[in-house]
């Protein structure tokens, strides 16, 4: 079974107003997004995001675990962990590890003089300054024309369109949300944000017409 990640932070390349948890300390604020992940109508795992903001500095950590079974036999497994540091809206560093059906991927990168240096399974290369990953949690990432895939280290050209204001079901609630469509090579997904700009939901089209969905934990 082949799945293309909505996470692009993964297949989750990949992939909240009502469930955004916000706590403030003396110097830092922490936000969390906790999603259940569904393949069509079947729950297959989770993807959690934790953000710590301290002035202009931001640290984001994510973890995803997915498993697809047929007759209780695992046919697909996925684990993704990623830590990113940001400063003034620019990616400063990334360190990720992914196990997709036993295939291991590592991505490490740091901002440096002349660009952003990335090391992946395929080697080392330099990207432009002030790049972004598929940072769904920050709607500003939609301004970029290319995004770093945190699973593979690929720098992916994307096309992003604003669809409009739509009603979104979130658990037992119906919310007014802004919908966007993001497309790239082997990638098609939709994102929803609240009126205040908080990330609410994600849906990704997979091979064979199946849908991968992120549903916020209530």
Segments and roles (model prediction):
Residues 2-15:
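Bacterial N-terminal signal peptides that target proteins for export
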Residues 5-6, 18, 27-28:
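Residue-level detector of intrinsically disordered, flexible termini
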Residues 13-23:
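Bacterial N-terminal signal peptides
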